[in-house]
């Protein structure tokens, strides 16, 4: 699928996030998800990435955010949130089936946009009171 570039070192270190991580005003699960996607988008934009698309849906899969690095690399971002890490945390909740759906959607998007750019899969996880950015969280060849 995408041509991987040498990954730049990601620290995986948590970034500060408000203690009240789950906005009550959002109401529905979809509203809460959209609020976290917006927070993730703003965080990534502050880190120098540019928004390409949000909520890309194709038959069989969806991508929360598609961003672009300054060097042109497409970054497919899955946003996850968990109140605590009791059951493995937000990042651990992305199983093989979910990764396969992400790959399907990313491949369709990548092909539609010319398929020339390098790409990677990142996860922005909100766990408890922290935001964790996992750069290059998984690769197309290790999804299954």
UniProtKB/Swiss-Prot annotation:
User: Which InterPro entries does this UniProt record tie to the protein?
Assistant: Restrct_endonuc-II-like (IPR011335), tRNA_endonuc-like_dom_sf (IPR011856), UPF0102_YraN-like (IPR003509)
- Transmembrane region(s): none
Disordered, as annotated region: 1-28
One term of GO molecular function: nucleic acid binding
Where in the chain are disulfide-linked cysteines found? none
Pfam families linked to this entry: UPF0102
Family membership: Belongs to the UPF0102 family.
For this entry, the protein name equals: UPF0102 protein BMA2801
Its source organism is Burkholderia mallei (strain ATCC 23344)
């Amino acid at each position: 699928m995408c041509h991987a570039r040498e990954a730049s070192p990601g620290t995986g270190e948590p970034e500060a996030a408000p203690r009240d991580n789950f906005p009550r005003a959002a109401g529905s699960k979809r509203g809460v998800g959209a609020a976290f996607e917006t927070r993730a988008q703003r965080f990534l934009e502050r880190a120098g990435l540019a928004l390409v698309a949000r909520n890309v849906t194709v038959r069989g899969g969806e991508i929360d955010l598609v961003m672009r690095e300054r060097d042109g690399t497409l970054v497919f971002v899955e946003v996850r949130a968990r109140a605590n890490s009791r059951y493995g945390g937000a990042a651990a909740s992305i199983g093989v089936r979910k990764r396969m759906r992400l790959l399907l959607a990313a491949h369709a998007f990548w092909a539609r946009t010319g398929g020339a750019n390098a790409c990677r899969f990142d996860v922005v996880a909100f766990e408890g009171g922290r935001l964790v950015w996992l750069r290059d969280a998984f690769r197309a060849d290790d999804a299954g």
